[in-house]
Design a protein with these regions (language model features):
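Amphipathic alpha-helical scaffolding segments
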Residues: 180-182
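Residue-level detector of solvent-exposed, low-hydrophobicity positions
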Residues: 12, 18, 38, 172-174
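A short secondary-structure junction signal
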Residues: 173-178, 207-209
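Aromatic (Trp/Tyr/Phe) and Gly/Pro-enriched flexible surface segments
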Residues: 20-158, 162, 187-238, 245-314
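Residue-level marker of positions within ordered structural domains that often coincide
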Residues: 6, 14, 36, 166-168, ...
Length: 315
């Protein structure tokens, strides 16, 4: 009898905790709406028409025009580039079937640019979704984050991000380095990852500064062959640098990233993280990135893939 009462008590406690949590879906995070873009590449590259996708309201756009990312909270690794008048499109993130609905598939691929039928440039691109926007057309590959306004205004303090997830991870310890001319291998293990940085930003003389309010960063070292629903990525607030779980890549920029954002003058400039905020401070912006690879731009393991669906905040 006493044992039964204990089990019943624990059950009610668990129900109470669950009832206290509030779940808020991110806009378009159910992956059921996509904008399809048709971009015609330059004749020098073969003149093919490529499909690009944006995680945004259902729509079809034709023509080599920059996308207006104010229509969505999501930036994406799919890029329309126009360098010196040469138009190019690259697609590494796309909708994929899941049951009767749709999820997002993020792939790491080698993107090859052929000029007049000959291989000229090869770059490694990891499929990525992130909160922010891309400043199109991309005009240079020399500064991968120079065209990205990273993060969105955000003043909430969620407990965690939850989503449905599946992953394909190559166990080999090698990473392809493909920055343009030629490819090489380095030792390492490329892993899909999810990270969340809550920041308190301010601007001085056109420069953007930030303190880190909240942090979550999780890498997937092994494949997840079957869907894992409601996967939880907990957010920790304040200075986590002395915690047992802390790893260097969770640290302040540049360890945690080398991202940029648009300042009040409309210029994309570096986000300078200058310290950890107190745990009780309120953020001004949030960065969320979901990506098929954990290495810097143009490094990765082709064949790695990440599937995601139903992205939500927990409060």
């Amino acid at each position: 009898m006493k044992k039964n009462l204990t089990i019943l008590f624990l059950f009610f406690i668990a129900c109470h905790i669950i009832a206290q949590e509030r779940i808020v879906p991110l806009r378009y995070g159910d992956m059921e709406q996509w904008t399809v873009r048709y971009i015609k590449e330059s004749k020098l590259l073969g003149g093919k028409t490529k499909q690009l996708y944006v995680l945004a309201a259902t729509d079809t756009l034709r023509g080599n025009q920059p996308y207006d990312f104010s229509k969505t909270i999501w930036g994406i690794s799919n890029a329309y580039a126009n360098v010196a008048g040469i138009a190019k499109a690259a697609c590494t993130t796309q909708p994929d079937k899941r049951g009767k609905g749709t999820c997002a598939r993020l792939d790491t691929r080698i993107e090859t640019v052929k000029v007049l039928g000959m291989i000229d440039i090869q770059v490694c691109i990891a499929g990525t979704l992130f909160l922010g926007e891309v400043n199109e057309p991309v005009k240079s590959a020399n500064d991968p984050y120079g065209s990205i306004n990273m993060g969105i205004p955000f003043t909430d303090k969620p407990k965690a991000l939850i989503l449905d997830i599946k992953a394909k991870v190559n166990p080999e310890r090698k990473v392809i380095k493909a920055l343009g001319l030629g490819m090489s291998e380095i030792e390492g293990h490329d892993e899909p990852e999810i990270y969340i940085f809550l920041q308190k930003r301010w601007e001085e003389n056109g420069k953007i500064y930030a303190k880190r309010v909240g942090t979550a960063r999780h890498r997937f070292a092994e494949s997840i062959p079957e869907w894992r629903n409601d996967y939880r990525v907990d957010i920790n607030y304040g200075d986590i640098s002395k915690e047992s779980y802390f790893k260097k890549y969770m640290g302040l920029f540049p360890d945690g990233g080398q991202f940029k954002a648009r300042n009040s003058q409309g210029k994309i400039t570096t986000i300078n993280e200058v310290g950890w905020a107190d745990a009780d401070e309120t953020p001004t912006h949030v960065i969320v990135m979901i990506t098929a690879g954990c290495y810097p731009a143009f490094y990765g393991c082709p064949g790695n893939a990440l599937w995601v669906d139903n992205i939500r905040w927990i409060y």
